Amino acid sequence: MVKQWFGVSRFVYNTTVKLLQDSSLKANWKAIKTDILNGLPEWSKSVPYQIKSIAIKDACKSVSNAKKKLKNGGGMSKIRFRSRKDTVQSCYIPKSAVKDVGIYHTILGEATFKEALPQSFGDCRLVFAYRDYYLTVPQDVPQQKSDNQGRVVALDPGIRTFITFFSECSFGEIGTAANLQIQKLCFRLDKLISKFTKAKCKQRRRMKLAASRLRGKIKNLVDEFHKKTARFLVDNFDIILLPTFETSQMSKKAKRRIRSKSVRQMLTLGHYRFKQFLKHKAFETNKVVMDVNEAYTSKTVSWTGEIIPNLGGAKFVKSPSDGQVMSRDMNGARGIFLRALVDTPSLKECIC
């Protein structure tokens, strides 16, 4: 029955998007809701009203955001239809339907949650991702109060080492060779996908389910890595200097200087998702994340100021003048730290 809810929600969303392709219609979900709901087929009548109603609202919001982006000069955005083949499906669940005994328990029956529900929460979404069901429950959490001790840390994101950090009193690496375990799972996934075309119907279905489980395992490993790293940073530092790590630009085929294997490792580690999550945790704990410029910090020897033009993919940086050697990632983090102290006037305000 839950799969039917996802299907009807998807059908209503796609119907609304198709209707709004007519430029004469405004994306006002309350104005078009009644006509759309009355025109739905008989097999969708048993699905709760609010699930269908909010699917219309979601479609109108997507169209409105695309129009707003075009108006503000952000370029044309194409609103795509939802597909039953999407790895993540979701539908709206009102908070009145969520009880300790389950979701819509009078329809679905009683169910148990892995975690206790908070005392007060808002409207939820039921998510089906990588063969598992999740109920996302929003709640209001007050911002934590903390004393600003002026502890500054610079981060250097990378591929071989996920994060290298450097501060006034400490330095280190987080996730040294973190991508090795993830890459093993990626290779297993590639090997499994390569067998799809040779498999028969039932075997192919089992393989697709196994591939979905592997994708979920990879995503869960990366998410856990992000959360533990963010927790360490916000617990030990007050100001976090994070360079603008342009993964989308670095991975474009036309201009990139790194191989496809490195591109895959970089995209799998999800540096942009980590950046967004870190900013969220920093706001929650009353800490500051500052976007800084990392230009030439890897090529510049941080203790002499010399520039090494042909550094390439070297793991270490060696000073031409004194012969001292430092890890490339550590040199980059130290360079970001020193550069931010000079080039970022707002840093002084945050420290004080």
Outline where the language-model segments fall.
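Stable alpha-helical structural segments in soluble proteins, enriched in small hydrophobic residues
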Residues: T16, I54-A66, M330-D343
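Positively charged, helix-rich recognition surfaces that bind polyanionic ligands
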Residues: A129-C352
